[in-house]
């Protein structure tokens, strides 16, 4: 089965009456695999990536979302990579607990970007963010270093 065929299968079998493809609750813990790669997602609607518990690194990169992108309540024992994301409406990155580094770089948001209640044991990298709306960064706890630079914000920068 190709990835294109898999997408067709998932839509045909998991789309509900509201038009949502619900893949929540997938459990790979009992499978003999090294990783699950969810990079490169392209979604015409909204994309929810929440309540994920990862013992290694979590890579959420190269994503194009024409609606809202929600990345919240994520617990990562390694590093969390949220880079090269393009979002048409709003990007929410909230309530993330990361034992390693959190990388939120090269993000382009046509609406607002909300980064709230992020707890990072390592370093937090928030660089090269392009936001046409408002950029909200609040209640971030970082035990390592905080790197913020090259922000281009057309709206308000709310820290």
Task: Write out the residue ranges for each language-model feature.
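Tandem repeat scaffolds
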Residues: 15-159
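The feature captures the LRR N-terminal capping module
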Residues: 1-21
